């Protein structure tokens, strides 16, 4: 059964765009159009432990680093900046690093799996993706940029898990597929792209085409050792699509999870990767689980039972429709579109904190 555990009054002075729990589910970070980030204890009183001020515009998203690096939090904003914060206690926070080399709003940030070190990916409306790597011994940051990652802008970014599928399940799993760093991004060109690090450069490995409008969110599912990878994508076109690959990530197939009543803004996997939470313009949060036949079913909030969603397994979509939608957005897109309007971006989900 799904039920409300707690309600927190953040006391932000404007729209709250995103909330994220830390690795242990104890500290909650929120961000808002008031330009601030606030830290709460998720299991105690509702008063903010700290208020982080450093942005001069709406803050779209926050992301926690793995606790092996300490209490580290990243935030991104319409002001084109990414700020990495560090705390000695939940109440005492300082600015560890500030990155300001994007030409437009920074819409999404995501820390890499801890096996790769302290690495942060950033997605921007200027069409590029930045990968920031910290040398933790010297406290020096290095930035690499993927220019022109998406036409018009990049809305979302997510890392591939470092843990590879178990070779015991599939002999096609190789050490190469396990060791290579990968990212998935979604953009205003209606595309989903998978990027691979190759000789200190980031190259486009796959281009996934199925959405007919802006891709608002992407989420690479946590690995539990099974011989496949899954990526969920959410779009303005009201669809959530789950992409699945074979063990060596050489081929991807798409399945439409559901067609919603309004645009879909945010998606989040459970820590075990078997439940997907979805929220969007219909002001609802729904939970979905894949059955043994590969069909996605919605979990009933009242009883905890599953309800099958009658959807086509694949979404028909032509290249000409994609081009038409892209041209329409090119004509309408502002110079700094940001991730979305306030009303759209108010329903983002906390990352990977769902119960399974």
Swiss-Prot record:
Membrane topology: Peripheral membrane protein
Protein name in the entry: Protein SEC13 homolog
Chain intervals with Low complexity compositional bias: 308-356
Quaternary structure, from the entry: Probable component of the nuclear pore complex (NPC). Component of the GATOR complex consisting of mio, Nup44A/Seh1, Im11, Nplr3, Nplr2, Wdr24, Wdr59 and Sec13. Within the GATOR complex, probable component of the GATOR2 subcomplex which is likely composed of mio, Nup44A/Seh1, Wdr24, Wdr59 and Sec13. Interacts with msk. Interacts (preferentially when phosphorylated) with Mad. The GATOR2 complex associates with unmet in the absence of S-adenosyl-L-methionine; the mio-Wdr24-Nup44A subcomplex is essential and sufficient for this interaction while Wdr59 and Sec13 are dispensable.
Function recorded in the entry: Functions as a component of the nuclear pore complex (NPC) and the COPII coat. At the endoplasmic reticulum, SEC13 is involved in the biogenesis of COPII-coated vesicles. Recruited to transcriptionally active chromatin at the time of transcription initiation by RNA polymerase II. Required for proper expression of ecdysone-responsive genes such as Eip74EF and Eip75B during larval development. Required for reactivation of transcription after heat shock. Required for nuclear import of phosphorylated Mad via importin msk.
Family named by the database record: Belongs to the WD repeat SEC13 family.
Pfam families assigned to the protein according to its UniProt record, in alphabetical order: WD40
SUPFAM superfamilies membership: WD40 repeat-like (SSF50978)
PANTHER family documented for this protein: NUCLEAR PORE COMPLEX PROTEIN SEC13 / SEH1 FAMILY MEMBER, PROTEIN SEC13 HOMOLOG
Domain of life the protein comes from: Eukaryota
UniProt keyword Repeat, yes or no: yes
Organism whose genome encodes this protein: Drosophila melanogaster (Fruit fly)
Reported phenotype of the disruption mutant: RNAi-mediated knockdown in the larva results in reduced transcription of developmental genes Eip74EF and Eip75B in the salivary glands, compromised transcriptional recovery after heat shock and defective recruitment of Nup98.
InterPro entries noted in UniProt: Sec13/Seh1_fam, WD40/YVTN_repeat-like_dom_sf, WD40_repeat_dom_sf, WD40_rpt
GO cellular component: centrosome; chromatin; COPII vesicle coat; endoplasmic reticulum membrane; GATOR2 complex; lysosomal membrane; nuclear pore outer ring; nucleoplasm
Tissue note: Salivary glands.
Keywords per UniProt: Cytoplasm, Cytoplasmic vesicle, Cytoskeleton, Developmental protein, Endoplasmic reticulum, Lysosome, Membrane, mRNA transport, Nuclear pore complex, Nucleus, Protein transport, Repeat, Transcription, Transcription regulation, Translocation, Transport, WD repeat
Annotated GO MF terms: chromatin binding; structural molecule activity
Subcellular location: Nucleus envelope; Nucleus, Nucleoplasm; Cytoplasm, Cytoskeleton, Microtubule organizing center, Centrosome; Nucleus, Nuclear pore complex
WD repeat intervals: 11-50, 54-95, 101-142, 149-205, 210-253, 259-298
Major localisation: nucleus
TM spans (from-to): none
A GO BP annotation: cellular response to heat
Region called Disordered, residue ranges: 307-356
């Amino acid at each position: 059964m799904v039920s409300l555990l707690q309600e927190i009054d953040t006391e932000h002075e404007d729209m709250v765009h995103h909330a994220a729990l830390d690795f242990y589910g104890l500290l909650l970070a929120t961000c808002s159009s008031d330009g601030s980030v606030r830290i709460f204890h998720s299991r105690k009183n509702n008063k903010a432990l700290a208020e982080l001020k450093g942005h001069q515009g709406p803050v779209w998203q926050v992301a926690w680093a793995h606790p092996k690096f300490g209490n580290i939090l990243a935030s991104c904003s319409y002001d084109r900046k990414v700020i990495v914060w560090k705390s000695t206690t939940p109440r005492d926070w300082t600015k560890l690093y500030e990155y300001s080399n994007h030409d437009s709003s920074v819409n999404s940030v995501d820390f890499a799996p801890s096996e790769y070190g302290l690495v942060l990916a950033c997605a921007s409306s200027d069409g590029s993706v930045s990968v920031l790597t910290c040398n933790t011994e010297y406290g020096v940051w290095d930035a690499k940029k993927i220019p022109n990652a998406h036409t018009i802008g990049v809305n979302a970014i997510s890392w591939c898990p470092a843990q590879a599928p178990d070779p015991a399940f599939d002999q096609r799993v190789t050490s190469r597929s396990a060791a290579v760093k990968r990212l998935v991004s979604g953009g205003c060109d209606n595309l989903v792209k998978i990027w691979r690090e190759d000789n200190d450069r980031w190259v486009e490995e796959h281009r996934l085409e199925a959405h007919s409008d802006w891709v608002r969110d992407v989420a690479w599912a946590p690995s539990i050792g099974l011989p496949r990878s899954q990526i969920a994508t959410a779009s303005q076109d009201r669809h959530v699509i789950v992409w699945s690959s074979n063990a060596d990530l050489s081929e991807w197939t798409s399945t439409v999870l559901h067609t919603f009543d309004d645009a879909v803004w945010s998606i989040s996997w459970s820590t075990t990767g078997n439940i997907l939470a979805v929220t969007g313009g219909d002001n609802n949060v729904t939970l979905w689980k894949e059955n043994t036949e590969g069909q996605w079913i919605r979990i009933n909030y009242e009883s905890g039972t599953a309800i099958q969603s009658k959807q086509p397994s694949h979404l028909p979509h032509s290249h000409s429709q994609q081009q038409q939608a892209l041209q329409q957005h090119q004509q309408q897109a502002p110079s700094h579109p940001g991730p979305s309007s306030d009303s759209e971006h108010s329903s983002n989900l906390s990352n990977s904190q769902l119960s399974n």
